[in-house]
Amino acid sequence: MIRAGIVGATGYTGVELLRLLLAHPGAEPAVVTSRGNAGERLDAMFPNLRGHTDLAFTEPDPGLLAECDVVFFATPHGVAHAMAGELLSRGTRVIDLSADFRIRDAALWSRWYGQPHGAPELLDQAVYGLPEINRKRIPDARLIAVPGCYPTAVSLGFIPLLEAGLVDTAHLVADAKSGVSGAGRKAQVGMLLCEASENFKAYGVAGHRHLPEILQTLGDVAGQTPGLTFVPHLLPMIRGIEASLYAVLKDMDTDLQALYEQRYAAEPFVDVMPPGSHPETRSVRGTNRCRIAVHRPQGGDTAVVLSVIDNLVKGASGQAVQNMNLMFGLPETAGLDGIAVLP
């Protein structure tokens, strides 16, 4: 049984990790840390865990965490910078759900996150944990950078078009919408019920922190950095991301449905829906699945790709567990085969 540590387990991605690991057939949470809640039982803070664990939060002690096989960081930016190096030196593998190691250029990371990069010496060994493009590198990785939620939905939607060289990469558009849990569990006026409910708005149009990550990923696939207009929106719901993606086709003869079905045929967590489909966020709620539909309206020169994920699962904690499974030689789907709850 894999012994897992979780640093920062009081946020939404942290408790989602707990939910997934407590039901996992090959792993278990062994150390769960929180500076502000040390000594408190997990199930006292999260009653949904009652009957599943007797663990209590502890202080983030590197010595205790180093006894784990793998440590997940579900923390604000900068925390993994400070702790990952020591854990790696002690032989513990690290899976970071924050953005600390996603961007390979330390100076670029600093510009977008407004602070110096705290561990640039670790960037070369960090593997970007999107299994659909990096599966061969993940098993041997010591440090995994789990992709962000928007980058996951957007990248999975665009990848087949870019790999095939079918579109004008200078003019891609990603119109993405997220539920409020994407902002985290901290108190914010804009996330209050009276502010977010019955409301819909764009934000970060001038530049969102996920933009350089998306550009890096799509650039790796396309062989050159694309031109991308990325506009995120806030939806009045708790979970879910819907990304509507647009690209101008260079080749009008390719069967886009067949392209997507063939590209993702062997992917356990990407579901290409039948022609004419419009995937719904509720169909992936609580699951590690990405559902995709591809369209070519009126037979024109524009490809429209619709991509939905649960931002807390495939967009965060589920993808982290998927990476853990690959790192430790477990079935990739272990602990991740749940079905979305409807309605």
UniProtKB/Swiss-Prot annotation:
Q: Name one GO biological process term.
A: L-arginine biosynthetic process
Q: InterPro entries per the record?
A: AGPR_AS, AGPR_type-1, NAD(P)-bd_dom_sf, NAGSA_dehydrogenase, Semialdehyde_DH_NAD-bd
Return the SMART domains for the record: Semialdhyde_dh
| Metabolic or biological pathway | Amino-acid biosynthesis; L-arginine biosynthesis; N(2)-acetyl-L-ornithine from L-glutamate: step 3/4
Q: Which HAMAP family match?
A: ArgC_type1 (MF_00150)
Q: What does the record give as the function of this protein? A: Catalyzes the NADPH-dependent reduction of N-acetyl-5-glutamyl phosphate to yield N-acetyl-L-glutamate 5-semialdehyde.
Indicate the residues that form the catalytic site: 149
Q: What is its EC number?
A: 1.2.1.38
Q: Which Pfam families match?
A: Semialdhyde_dh (PF01118), Semialdhyde_dhC_1 (PF22698)
Which terms in the Gene Ontology molecular function aspect does this entry carry?
Answer: N-acetyl-gamma-glutamyl-phosphate reductase activity; NAD binding; NADP+ binding
Query: What reactions does this protein catalyze?
Result: N-acetyl-L-glutamate 5-semialdehyde + phosphate + NADP(+) = N-acetyl-L-glutamyl 5-phosphate + NADPH + H(+)
- Species whose genome carries this gene: Thioalkalivibrio sulfidiphilus (strain HL-EbGR7)
Q: Any idea which UniProt keywords this protein has? A: Amino-acid biosynthesis, Arginine biosynthesis, Cytoplasm, NADP, Oxidoreductase
Chief place of localization: cytoplasm
Q: Where in the cell is it found?
A: Cytoplasm
Q: Indicate the family of this protein.
A: Belongs to the NAGSA dehydrogenase family. Type 1 subfamily.
This protein is called what?
Answer: N-acetyl-gamma-glutamyl-phosphate reductase
Q: Which SUPFAM superfamilies match?
A: Glyceraldehyde-3-phosphate dehydrogenase-like, C-terminal domain, NAD(P)-binding Rossmann-fold domains
**A Gene Ontology term for the protein's cellular component:** cytoplasm
Q: Which PANTHER family does the entry mention?
A: N-ACETYL-GAMMA-GLUTAMYL-PHOSPHATE REDUCTASE, CHLOROPLASTIC-RELATED, N-ACETYL-GAMMA-GLUTAMYL-PHOSPHATE REDUCTASE, CHLOROPLASTIC-RELATED-RELATED
